[in-house]
Amino acid sequence: MATKIRLKRQGKKFYAFYRVVVVDSRKKRDGKVIEEIGIYNPNTQPSTIQIKSDRAQYWLGVGAQPSEPVFKLLNITGDWQKYKGLEGAEGTLKTVEAGPDAEARIAAVENQAQKLKAAKSEAAAKAKAEAEAAAAAEEAPAEEAAEEAPAEA
C-alpha cells in the first residue's frame, strides 16, 4: 500500500488548522486515515506544531512519503534530519515562553479569584446573620402574643 504523510484540514472557513496524518495515497484529502501523528495550527503566534516523533520515524522507516507541507514541518521539528541521519536533528521549532507579562496576568487572575471568593463568603455570612436575626424577631412577637393570650382568659 502506498502511504503518504499529509495534512488533513479541519476548522472553519478562513480559520483552518490541520492534523498530520498517515493515509493511503489514493484516499481523499479528508478521508479515512491510518493514523494521526500530529497537529499543525498556523493561526497561533508562533504556529503550533506537535508531531509524535517516534511515530513519524516509524512511518518514514516503512516507506511513507511526506507531502511538501509535511516535509517542511518535519524539517522544522528535526524529524527529517533524524530520519536521514543529518545534522540539526534538534530542529528549529520556536516555542513561546511565559514572560513576566504572562506571570503578572496569572497572578492578577488568582488575586481576583481570591477577592471574589472572600466577598462571596462574606455575603453568605451576612445573609446567614440576617436570617437568624429575622427568625429571632419573628419568634419574639409570637412568644409575647402567647403570653398575653392566657393572661386575658
Curated annotation (Swiss-Prot):
Keywords: Ribonucleoprotein, Ribosomal protein. The keyword Ribosomal protein applies. Pfam families: Ribosomal_S16 (PF00886). GO terms for biological process: translation. PROSITE patterns: RIBOSOMAL_S16 (PS00732). Residues 140-153 have a biased composition (Acidic residues). InterPro entries: Ribosomal_bS16 (IPR000307), Ribosomal_bS16_CS (IPR020592), Ribosomal_bS16_dom_sf (IPR023803). One of its GO terms (molecular function) is structural constituent of ribosome. GO terms for cellular component: cytoplasm; small ribosomal subunit. Residues 130-153 are annotated as: Disordered. HAMAP family: Ribosomal_bS16 (MF_00385). NCBIfam families: PRK14520.1, S16. Belongs to the bacterial ribosomal protein bS16 family. This is Small ribosomal subunit protein bS16.
